[in-house]
């Protein structure tokens, strides 16, 4: 870190001597500048980003805002006087202050300066949280997600973890990553800490998430469960009833259409009883009345909708449809014009308007309307519109020009209609609404300078910044509506494309302003279109302001990139590369590829919980660091080498509050090591006097367990480490950037390493093993393996499988049959990365029947094609001409059978015995296979799985679980085509997934080879024939498709190498940061390896020993903290073949000390929680018992006995 003359300690919190000296040095220039009294400094010292959204809950919230403004001027004046040569804490604190005043551009600027000056910025959770809030405000969701995930990674007990989970839930929901969204909503729901949303509001969003996923019965059950809650807030109840009404109108939940509409109307009427001013409920009610033919009631409801809320393009479009049904074309025209003037991109209104003109025999105007509809990004039937436009144009060409000119028009042309006056009720209503909103908005945002933001975006921000009803005083009304109201109304604006009566309208911009967060369903592939205008302004503001303010002082700036889903991706780039467009990196903050940090705690007493504060002190120890010139992430190959393995352990001082403190998590203090205390200053910006800083603890992996535990005890009765198992000195995990220099284009299709076996001796030749596990070979194809070893592949044929176990379960993935290596959207209009496949289950017998029928059908189709050769050449030329632009849709549906478990030795004895003929390094079980030391079966990893395929069946892109190697043998009779990308390019594919709103780890995706070629990503491509074995090396990315009818068997292998262990642990930590379960329990496995294996490779030994050291310390400190808090630890030893325990809430591995609810313990179900989730559920752990699976003496013995074994060469 760069250290300068003026420190935050001197400016705000230093001792009197330092302050007097500083004041004397400043001399007369201090006069006339802003100054802070001692009391004001004390009031400010505890404020950081964790108060965002909670400041108004203080008794003196208004006075605090005034003080914040004063403090900002004070700090800025000091920075000016020091010519910018101040310590980094100034900028971090300025960022916090500006954030609390909602001046986001200034907050971002200050945070950027802090980042550029502070080398280990990632240790400061409050900084990361504030940065995430700013990115969230600017709708830079991918950046906000990264920042929030890093907060939870470095500090799982961060006091605003619940707020983070809420925001992550919303962002993943907007990105259509519903599984991740649900997980974070559930994590927020179990947290008992204070939050800006109540538990019932969180439950509502979980219910709506089910609805968005089209899990309507689950959504209905969740909504009805909410209605059973006594004293349910009126606004929540109204919105729940609204959603139930709309679902009954749209979905086949019960009975016939008449019954559906009756229930829908009843629910909506009840909703209006709770909230008669809900324009959305009135609109939905109008739709229901229109559906059953109650025209007058529908008109009345639509009128009420316009009166109760902002004018909506949806409403006016529906009114137009109603007029058109009543044969009132002029009134319908006027309503449609209102709709498209409110939202120029309202595809449904343009289509309905085109239908109206066409019905009035005005094809020219109809064509214009259809063209506007087709240009709209919300249009989902472009192909049908295009066909209709061509048909009408052909008709016009056949008509004489005179007939067109002399024809009487029933309606004004589109140009004339556009100029007609809008109904007075619309203009007056819209003008009054905008005026009122602007007035309230200006009052509330008086402290902001970003006045250019739209009303829509201000509402959006206020909701998500926790300025809901609870944030205001009893007599003070929030601007517009409360946060909960906005949250609920946002979710209630549902998909309206499911009623078949007419072409349905989409939400207009006006409607988006009223309901800031339009939640689309999976059918609508137009994610967050409602925020496009605000994103334009915010992204431009973000770029211009930061570049203008920080161009000379920061090494990063913000660059907005627009992507196809209309979300602006923000990229962080070095200032020096601004003029080089090719050097822009997609990373949020460019850092080295991470390992991990363990945080050790110390007790702090007298914790205050008055207003749900964050009881956390940010101790920034300002040691001198040299900022690396190149911040680009290194590849994983070098990320955890022996050079970076620190054998001398320097602990971060991650201090925690007392272990048992009610209504609070383990509120932490983020500290940093004191490399140079003489030239650095420890700054306390917390609410209370700074706690005693824990001295650095230095132990080596070669230290005995006695020395390790003694060093732990020397820290006193400390708190808890976070259980990470890599290094302390590196930031949170990050995907690697693309290797540099990039490969030339001619090397992007490299030849696949292949080995041809002629006999059994070749298969057992030792260099074959070394060739396969060499990190330079991402994949190896061993040709002719089955023949060389005389394997009976017929044991795995479909016929034999049916005879052996015909009722065995098969997981089926229903997919679309795509052309060649491409992946098109269902309409066949564009290539996409998202690969749709739905999961179900069947039996081997039924899938075998499907496989056989598919083959017979293919034979029939082939015969039919041969008989239709007369048009073959024409069809061929047409297809080749269009191959690059579109594909004929709809695509045929096929089914792929996967994850067929062959682990049961009793059922599959012959099959499993046959595989023992394989060489040891590819066997399912062997001493040199790490997965054989897990101690229990992990299906598909240390056991065999089988896939049954038909042509076109695909396994989407992925890396193996925890980056282990993979073995795949093609049984035949058909071939498979493989696509493989080396491990060090997985970061590039992760970026592509993010740009396409996909989760690299959890989503189904099929890469576009053209995108990879443009990004200079090499792709190995080869055919796997029957009897060939494909070895996928550690971390290799791959995707596969069948080009014939075939079966495959597969399992994972873990070579006993440092490279394999390193990648496995890196992925373990990346999974933890991404809130994804690691299938392989690396902590449990590491201890078993120490028990069972003699390791002679120094690199591998050091990594395993380091893991043992970290976990031994974690167990010791956690156990001592529990005992000191009076919490009894009960013995609960492990049994043979017992799976490693995982937290039932967050799915992280839990080692040794298990937190189990009292109820679960008494029922012997043992539902496990990790310490973090246990404390969030029950602040003082009163509802939990702690079970211990290993005696500390046993762990100590394993640790001491695990030593570096002599290598074979040295032994000889």
Swiss-Prot record:
Its cofactor is L-ascorbate; Fe(2+). PANTHER family: HISTONE DEMETHYLASE UTY, LYSINE-SPECIFIC DEMETHYLASE. It comes from the Eukaryota. Male-specific histone demethylase that catalyzes trimethylated 'Lys-27' (H3K27me3) demethylation in histone H3. Has relatively low KDM activity. Gene3D superfamilies: 1.20.58.1370, 2.10.110.20, Cupin, Tetratricopeptide repeat domain. Disulfide bonds: none annotated. It comes from Mus musculus (Mouse). The modification Phosphothreonine is found at residue 752. This is Histone demethylase UTY. Residues 530-555, 865-886 are annotated as: Disordered. The lineage of its organism: Eukaryota, Metazoa, Chordata, Craniata, Vertebrata. Binds TLE1 and TLE2. GO terms for biological process: cardiac muscle cell contraction; embryonic organ development; establishment of protein localization; heart development; heart morphogenesis; heterochromatin formation; in utero embryonic development; regulation of gene expression. GO terms for molecular function: histone H3K27me2/H3K27me3 demethylase activity; histone H3K36 demethylase activity; metal ion binding; RNA polymerase II cis-regulatory region sequence-specific DNA binding. Belongs to the UTX family. Zn(2+) binds at residues 1143, 1146, 1170, 1173. TPR repeats lie at residues 88-121, 125-158, 165-193, 200-233, 245-278, 279-312, 313-346, 347-380. Keywords: Chromatin regulator, Dioxygenase, Iron, Metal-binding, Nucleus, Oxidoreductase, Phosphoprotein, Repeat, TPR repeat, Zinc. The keyword Zinc applies.
């Amino acid at each position: 870190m760069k250290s300068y003359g003026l420190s935050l300690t001197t400016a705000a919190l230093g001792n009197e001597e330092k302050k007097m000296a500083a004041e004397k040095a400043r001399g007369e220039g201090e006069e006339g500048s802003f100054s802070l009294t001692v009391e004001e400094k004390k009031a400010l010292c505890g404020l950081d980003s964790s108060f965002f959204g909670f400041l108004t809950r203080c008794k003196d919230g208004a006075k605090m805002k005034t003080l914040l403004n004063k403090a900002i001027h004070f700090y800025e004046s000091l920075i000016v006087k020091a010519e910018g040569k101040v310590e980094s804490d100034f900028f971090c604190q300025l960022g916090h202050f500006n954030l609390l005043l909602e001046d986001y551009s200034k907050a971002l600027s200050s945070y950027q300066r802090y980042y550029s000056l502070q080398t280990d910025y990632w240790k400061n959770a409050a900084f990361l949280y504030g940065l995430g809030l700013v990115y969230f405000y600017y709708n830079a969701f991918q950046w906000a997600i990264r920042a929030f995930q890093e907060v939870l990674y470095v500090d799982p007990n961060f006091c605003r973890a619940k707020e983070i989970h809420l925001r992550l839930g919303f962002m993943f929901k907007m990105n259509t990553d519903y599984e991740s969204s649900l997980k974070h909503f559930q994590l927020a729901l179990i947290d008992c800490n204070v939050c800006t949303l109540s538990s019932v509001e969180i439950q509502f969003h979980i219910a709506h998430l089910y609805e968005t996923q089209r899990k309507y019965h689950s959504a209905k059950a969740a909504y009805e469960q909410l209605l059973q809650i006594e004293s349910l807030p009126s606004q929540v109840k109204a919105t729940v009833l609204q959603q139930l009404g709309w679902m009954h109108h749209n979905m086949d939940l019960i009975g016939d259409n008449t019954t559906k509409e009756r229930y829908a109307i009843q629910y909506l009427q009840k909703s209006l009883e709770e909230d008669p001013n809900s324009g959305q409920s009135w609109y939905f009610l109008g739709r229901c009345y229109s559906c059953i033919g109650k025209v007058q009631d529908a008109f009345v409801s639509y009128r009420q909708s316009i009166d109760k809320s902002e004018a909506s393009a949806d409403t006016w479009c529906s009114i137009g449809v109603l007029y058109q049904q009543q044969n009132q074309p002029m009134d319908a025209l006027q309503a449609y014009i209102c709709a498209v003037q409110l939202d120029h991109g309202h595809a449904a209104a343009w289509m309905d308007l085109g239908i109206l003109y066409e019905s009035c025999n005005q094809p020219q105007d109809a064509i214009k309307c259809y063209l506007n509809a087709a240009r709209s990004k919300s249009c989902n039937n472009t192909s049908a519109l295009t066909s209709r436009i061509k048909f009408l144009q052909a008709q016009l060409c056949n008509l004489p020009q005179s007939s067109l000119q002399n024809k009487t028009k029933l309606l004004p042309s589109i140009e004339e209609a556009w100029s007609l006056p809008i109904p007075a009720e619309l203009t007056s209503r819209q003008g009054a609404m905008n005026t009122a909103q602007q007035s309230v908005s200006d009052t509330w945002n008086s402290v902001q300078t970003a006045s250019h933001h739209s009303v829509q975006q201000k509402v959006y921000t206020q909701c998500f910044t926790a300025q809901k009803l609870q944030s205001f005083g009893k007599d003070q009304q929030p601007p517009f509506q409360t946060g909960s109201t906005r949250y609920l109304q946002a979710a209630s604006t549902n998909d309206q494309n499911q009623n078949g009566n007419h072409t349905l309208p989409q939400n207009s911009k006006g409607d988006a302003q009223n309901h800031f967060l339009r939640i689309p369903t999976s059918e609508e592939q137009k994610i967050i279109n409602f925020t496009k205008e605000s994103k334009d302004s915010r992204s431009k503001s973000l770029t211009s302001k930061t570049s203008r303010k920080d161009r000379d002082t920061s090494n990063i700036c913000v660059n907005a990139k627009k992507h196809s889903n209309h979300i602006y991706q923000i990229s962080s780039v070095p200032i020096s590369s601004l003029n080089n467009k090719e050097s822009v990196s997609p990373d949020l903050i460019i850092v080295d590829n991470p390992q991990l940090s363990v945080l050790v705690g110390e007790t702090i007493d007298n914790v205050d919980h008055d207003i749900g504060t964050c009881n956390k002190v940010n101790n920034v120890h300002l040691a001198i660091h040299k900022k690396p010139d190149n911040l680009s992430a290194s590849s994983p190959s070098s990320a955890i080498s022996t050079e970076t393995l620190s054998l001398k352990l320097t602990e971060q001082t991650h201090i925690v509050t007392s272990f048992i403190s009610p209504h609070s998590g383990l509120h932490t203090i983020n500290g940093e090591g004191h490399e140079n205390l003489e030239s650095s200053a420890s700054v306390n910006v917390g609410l209370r006097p700074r706690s005693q800083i824990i001295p650095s603890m230095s132990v080596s992996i070669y230290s005995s367990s006695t020395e390790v535990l003694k060093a732990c005890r020397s820290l006193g009765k400390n708190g808890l480490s976070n259980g990470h198992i890599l290094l302390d000195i590196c930031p949170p995990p990050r995907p690697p950037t693309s290797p540099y220099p990039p490969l030339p284009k001619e090397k992007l299709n490299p030849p696949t390493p292949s080995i041809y076996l002629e006999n059994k001796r070749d298969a057992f030749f030792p260099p074959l093993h070394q060739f396969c596990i060499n990190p330079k070979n991402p994949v190896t194809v061993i040709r002719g393996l089955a023949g060389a070893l005389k394997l009976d592949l017929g044991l795995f044929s479909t016929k034999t499988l049916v005879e052996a176990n015909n009722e065995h379960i098969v997981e089926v993935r229903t997919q679309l049959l795509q052309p060649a290596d491409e992946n098109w959207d269902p309409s066949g209009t564009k290539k996409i990365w998202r690969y749709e496949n739905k999961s179900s289950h069947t039996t081997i017998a039924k899938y075998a029947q499907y496989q056989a029928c598919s083959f017979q059908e293919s034979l029939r189709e082939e015969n039919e094609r041969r008989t239709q050769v007369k048009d073959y050449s024409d069809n061929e030329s047409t297809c080749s001409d269009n191959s690059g632009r579109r594909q004929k849709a709809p695509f045929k549906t096929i089914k792929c059978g996967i994850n067929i478990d062959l682990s049961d030795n009793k059922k599959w004895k012959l099959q499993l015995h046959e595989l023992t003929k394989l060489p040891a390094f590819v066997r399912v079980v062997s001493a040199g296979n790490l997965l054989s030391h897990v101690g229990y079966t992990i299906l598909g990893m240390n056991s065999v799985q089988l896939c049954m395929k038909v042509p076109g069946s695909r396994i989407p892109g992925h890396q193996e679980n925890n980056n282990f190697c993979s073995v795949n043998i093609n049984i035949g009779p058909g071939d498979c085509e493989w696509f493989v990308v080396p491990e060090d390019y997985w970061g590039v594919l992760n970026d592509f997934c993010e740009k396409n709103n996909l989760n690299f780890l959890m989503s189904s995706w099929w890469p576009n080879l053209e995108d990879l070629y443009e990004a200079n990503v090499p792709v190995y491509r080869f055919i796997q024939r029957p009897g060939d074995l494909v070895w996928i090396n550690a971390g290799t990315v791959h995707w596969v498709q069948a080009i014939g009818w075939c079966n495959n068997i597969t399992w994972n292998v873990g070579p006993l190498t440092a490279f394999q262990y390193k990648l496995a642990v890196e992925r373990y930590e990346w999974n933890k940061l991404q809130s994804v379960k690691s299938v392989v329990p690396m902590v449990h496995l590491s201890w078993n390896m120490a028990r069972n294996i003699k390791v002679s490779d120094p690199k591998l030994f050091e990594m395993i020993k380091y893991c043992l050291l970290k976990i031994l310390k974690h167990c010791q400190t956690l156990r001592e903290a529990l005992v000191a808090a009076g919490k009894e630890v009960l013995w609960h030893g492990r049994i043979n073949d017992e799976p490693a325990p995982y937290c039932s809430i967050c799915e992280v591995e839990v080692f040794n000390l298990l937190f189990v609810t009292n109820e679960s313990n008494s029922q012997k179900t043992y539902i496990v929680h990790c310490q973090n989730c246990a404390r969030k559920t029950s602040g003082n752990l009163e509802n939990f018992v702690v079970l211990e699976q290993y005696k500390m003496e046993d762990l100590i013995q394993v640790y001491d006995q695990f030593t570096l074994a002599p290598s074979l060469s040295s032994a000889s």
